[in-house]
Amino acid sequence: MRDARPVHRVRVGGFWMDIHEVTNDEFGEFVEATGYVTVAEQPPQAEDFPGAPPENLVAGSIVFTPPSEEVPVRDASGTAHLRWWAYVPGASWRHPAGPASDLEGRGDEPVVHVAYEDAEAYAAWAGKRLPS
């Protein structure tokens, strides 16, 4: 970030930002209108992950999964945080905790399991853009 130093004044023009995150219902309208398929709903391609076992090339996403035992926030290996997240096959915006979950009663909650390109596609459809 060469333009961040030395400290200097910057003028930013006016802009609009939505009052809340995009909800499941709003994202659902976009998907229904366009037929869009999110990154989490698409299985990884073998050519993008050479040597990966075929059983690992399944659509899904990483889900916050608190461990049953106490885990330090930091450890010597620097990997303690990895115990809080798990790749769940079938997890997507439609199934936020995995294939057995759904959006029942979650229409007003923020959509999850959305990749950057998914957010860009939604913003373009909604006549908006992502903040930079």
Give residue ranges: language-model regions.
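Extended beta-strand/loop cores of jelly-roll/beta-sandwich
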Residues: M1-P131
